[in-house]
Amino acid sequence: MNTSRYYQYIFPGTIAFSVVLMLIGLSMGHPEQLLPGLWKIVTMQDLLITDYIHIAGPAAAFVNAGLVTIISILIIKLAKDPFNGFTIVEMGLMAGFSLFGKNVFNIWPIILGTWLYARYQKEPFSKYASVALLATALAPLVSYMA
């Protein structure tokens, strides 16, 4: 059985997943609460586990999860890292932990640090893109220290 032909569906499937997360968020709250909720998520000093649904409401939390997931998908795509089963695991982790702790702001320093490391090693970022996304498990520390 040739499973590699199924890999072509991972990219559109993960994009659809992130769009569904954002649509769930948009349907769960009033639109006027969305931007203040996202602002609260981004500016709040996070501990390792901060429940964004409790802090900012389900609308902002699910939109944040969708945004972080789509950013992660684009990082994998732009790095030309192949989409495979591990990509699905990464997107699930990124989406899940975006409901408590990760946000569109605090993931960037870790991803940038990984990119700089790849440049320093003179290796393609695609070799480290998955590691960068998994390393964002420490993203709440960025918010805590900022």
What are the language-model segments listed below?
Residues 1-102:
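N-terminal signal-anchor module of multipass membrane proteins
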Residues 64-72, 76, 88-122, 127, ...:
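Alpha-helical transmembrane segments in multi-pass membrane proteins
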